[in-house]
């Protein structure tokens, strides 16, 4: 479980000092809870995010534990280093909006026909309660030929999960190489 520190002071100088000490500035918020300004050690946070199996994960701040999901993050445009993260605290039974990653498997037929695999949408917007949240959408790209794509309406449907993206948006496809 990730452990963070609660920030008593939210001044710019305090944030700079924390960043200099290797901390990532974060904000935990959600329905029915007060915003918590906090900070996590940067390297353990990144390592934990890469190793986690589910979108929802626990964090401990002071004496409280929250079930959270990464809602938004900011990176330095030059160094690509993570500088801020917003964590949404979720409550069982309460619907929220989430962004679920898209993963693909297989090698498209179109790659042999001089095509290029194009991932158009890396995340799908959904609305559901946390207990129904899928960890990812898996797309089999093996049957795709040149100029074929998988649309949002072609994704597997999960019970009690409403996809918010428009049905006709392409998620992944094979385009012709120039």
Swiss-Prot record:
InterPro entries: Rbsml_bL25/Gln-tRNA_synth_N (IPR020056), Ribosomal_bL25/Gln-tRNA_synth (IPR011035), Ribosomal_bL25_b-dom (IPR020057), Ribosomal_bL25_C (IPR037121), Ribosomal_bL25_long (IPR001021), Ribosomal_L25_dom (IPR029751), Ribosomal_uL5_bac-type (IPR020930). GO terms for biological process: translation. The gene is rplY. It comes from Helicobacter pylori (strain P12). Part of the 50S ribosomal subunit; part of the 5S rRNA/L5/L18/L25 subcomplex. Contacts the 5S rRNA. Binds to the 5S rRNA independently of L5 and L18. This is Large ribosomal subunit protein bL25. This is one of the proteins that binds to the 5S RNA in the ribosome where it forms part of the central protuberance. PANTHER family: RIBOSOMAL PROTEIN L25/GLN-TRNA SYNTHETASE, ANTI-CODON-BINDING DOMAIN-CONTAINING PROTEIN, RIBOSOMAL PROTEIN L25_GLN-TRNA SYNTHETASE, ANTI-CODON-BINDING DOMAIN-CONTAINING PROTEIN. Belongs to the bacterial ribosomal protein bL25 family. CTC subfamily.
């Amino acid at each position: 479980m990730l452990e963070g520190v609660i920030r008593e002071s939210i001044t710019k100088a305090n944030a700079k000092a924390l960043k200099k000490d290797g901390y990532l500035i974060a904000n935990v918020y959600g329905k029915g809870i007060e915003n918590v300004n906090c900070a996590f050690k940067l390297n353990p946070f990144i390592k934990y995010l890469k190793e986690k199996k589910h979108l929802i994960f626990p964090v401990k701040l002071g004496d409280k534990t929250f079930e959270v999901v990464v809602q938004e993050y900011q990176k330095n445009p030059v160094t690509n280093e993570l500088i801020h993260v917003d964590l949404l605290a979720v409550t069982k039974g309460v619907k929220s909006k989430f962004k679920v990653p898209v993963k693909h498997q297989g090698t498209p037929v179109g790659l042999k026909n001089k095509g290029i695999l194009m991932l158009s949408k890396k995340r799908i917007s959904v609305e559901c309660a946390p207990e129904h949240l899928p960890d990812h959408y898996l797309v089999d790209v093996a049957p795709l030929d040149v100029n074929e794509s998988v649309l949002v309406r072609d994704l597997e449907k999960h019970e009690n999960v409403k996809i918010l993206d428009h049905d006709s948006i392409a998620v992944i496809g094979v385009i012709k190489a120039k």
